[in-house]
Amino acid sequence: MDRLIEAIDNTQNPSVVGLDPTEALVPPRGRGELCREVRDSVESPEEVESAQLAVAYFEYNRTIIDAIADIVPAVKPQIAMYEALGPAGVDIYTMTCEYAAQQGLYVLGDIKRGDIGSTRSRLRHHLNRRGATFDPVA
């Protein structure tokens, strides 16, 4: 927490940028290339599309991180968005967190399970397509 407070003081900005990519947000270009880390996690041809989208998520995140690294103290990647893409998505979540930290940003892992509709939708999508329990208050 001390590091976050210091980062807020240094930037004079208490904002946190959420990194919650969805397929609708990322441009279709660049989905063809798979980086080594992602390629190694793909076990079947069916996972290629998810892996390509995961790489697009990373490029999208990297563009945002590069644009805001001098302006805000922290980013908050929402793990459900990445988990929905399977192993490649989890790898991209990790790569995103590492890249943000390398750029000097404080990384808040948004890994809660009782969350808003878009997160619940992504969790439901990959954990159990028929139903799932979530925060009863949400």
Annotated model-derived regions:
Residues D2-L25, R29-A138:
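Active-site loop-to-helix "anion-binding N-cap" substructures in soluble metabolic enzymes
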